[in-house]
Amino acid sequence: MQTIAILGSTGSIGTQALELVRLHPEEFRVVALTARSSREKLFEQVREFRPEVAGLTEPIPMSEIPEDVRFCRWVMGKEALRVAAAEVPADMVLVSVVGIAGLQSVMDALGANRQVLLANKEALVTGGHLVMDAAKRIGKPILPVDSEHSAIFQCLQDEIGRASCRERV
């Protein structure tokens, strides 16, 4: 069973990832969920997937967290992304947070030897060489999950199935 931390779980890509987990519970277990501010949606996800850690990057007082979701560790602020990316034992970290915050999350995950599933182009635009060097150092490629990024990634591979995607020079 693969464990996954989902940073940005209440957004479009995060909810799609959770749908895959829902369809394949024997293959995946969610260990961390984070969101920016969609707390009600995050509370619902925590109830269903029962992660070890949950967090909001826009902090709220613990008194505003419902009793029935306090079974997991709650982390607030930027620390939520770091804890979910690097502290919680996870095989994979899906980084689907918006903007430059994604770069630090990617670097934290790679620093903890995690497989990064990337849905944040800003991380590569602003720190591409840092990200790719870190991925190379741990021997794990960055796997794009956004549709456009994934299409480009697939076309740059030597082979997909039996068909070659690019000419060899």
What are these regions (language model features)?
Residues M1-A54:
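N-terminal Rossmann-like dinucleotide-binding module
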Residues Q2, R50-E52, R70-C72, A112-Q115, ...:
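A short helix->loop->beta-strand "cap" motif at the edges of active sites that frequently abuts
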Residues T10, V46, V93, N113, ...:
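Residue-level signal for inorganic ion chemistry
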Residues Q16-L23, E44-Q45, T126-G139, C155-D158:
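Active-site-proximal loop->helix
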Residues G55-T57, R73-A80:
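Short acidic-hydrophobic, aromatic-tinged amphipathic segments that line or gate anion-handling sites
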Residues I65, I100-A112, K121-P141:
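Rossmann-fold NAD(P)-binding glycine/threonine-rich loop
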Residues M76-A109:
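Beta-loop-alpha module in the N-terminal Rossmann-like domain of NAD(P)-dependent dehydrogenases
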Residues E159-V169:
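Residue-level detector of conserved catalytic or cofactor/ligand-binding positions
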